[in-house]
Swiss-Prot record:
Pathway: Carbohydrate degradation; pentose phosphate pathway; D-glyceraldehyde 3-phosphate and beta-D-fructose 6-phosphate from D-ribose 5-phosphate and D-xylulose 5-phosphate (non-oxidative stage): step 2/3. This is Probable transaldolase. Disulfide bonds: none annotated. It comes from Brucella anthropi (strain ATCC 49188 / DSM 6882 / CCUG 24695 / JCM 21032 / LMG 3331 / NBRC 15819 / NCTC 12168 / Alc 37). Keywords: Cytoplasm, Pentose shunt, Schiff base, Transferase. It catalyses: D-sedoheptulose 7-phosphate + D-glyceraldehyde 3-phosphate = D-erythrose 4-phosphate + beta-D-fructose 6-phosphate. It holds the Pfam family TAL_FSA. Belongs to the transaldolase family. Type 3B subfamily. GO terms for cellular component: cytoplasm.
Length: 217
């Protein structure tokens, strides 16, 4: 499974990248707002830090303007991935951009039907929103499972990018079901390493080691 970090915070991205935990980055208009930076400037900096795909989202909702904004975003770096909403105009733009060799991340996916259309349009990634579905009382993981089955049935190459991930359990369940990628906030990715028994065991080992009076280096 690949891990993408869902943030536009360059400091956080650099830290996780140095740990070897980042395969890519996803951003959206809300994260750009939170960063307080210019979208082109911050996205270019992120692309220089991370070797994998960096998703940057268009703000337009109509095809013609989507294509204009996509052209600007595509020039930022070779590892850029153009993010589009799963709408009719978005699917049309996806088909045009993917046919031209661009990576495309179709976002705001809440149904298996939307994921099927995105795959047919040539999307590189489909981003089903787990947490937001959970908020409505629907199990977001069921959507991941449905998409996995459909893509396997027809050998679609579009990768399932589990998004709106809020907990370490979301990450585990997405991995068990077979999502290709999980994108999560920095805090969630860091929390994956934590377990109380690990902390307790380390505390015991360190206390016992101190009693030996030895040094390794």
């Amino acid at each position: 499974m690949k891990f993408f970090v869902d943030t536009a915070d360059v400091k956080e991205i650099r830290e996780l990248n140095d740990l070897g935990l980042v395969d890519g980055v996803t951003t959206n208009p809300s994260l750009i707002l939170k960063s307080g930076r210019d979208i082109i400037e911050v996205t270019k900096e992120i692309c220089n830090i991370v070797k994998g795909p960096v998703s940057a989202e268009v703000a337009a909702t109509e095809y013609e303007q989507m294509m204009k904004e996509a052209a600007v975003i595509a020039k930022i770096a070779d590892n850029i991935c153009i993010k589009l909403p799963v709408t009719l105009d978005g699917l049309k733009a996806c088909k045009a951009l993917s046919s031209d060799g661009h990576k495309v991340n179709m976002t705001l996916c809440f149904s298996a039907n939307q994921a099927l259309l995105a795959a047919k349009a040539g999307a590189t990634f489909i981003s089903p929103f787990i947490g937001r579905l959970d908020d409505t009382g629907i199990n977001g993981m069921e959507l991941i499972a449905e998409i996995r089955t459909i893509y396997d049935n027809y050998d679609y190459r579009t990768e399932i990018l589990a998004a709106s991930v809020r907990t370490v359990n979301h990450v585990k369940e997405a991995a068990l079901i077979g999502a290709d990628v999980v994108t999560a906030p920095p805090a969630t990715l860091k929390a994956l390493v934590k377990h109380p028994l690990t902390d307790k065991g380390l505390e015991t080992f360190l206390a016992d080691w101190a009693k030996t009076g030895q040094k390794i280096a």
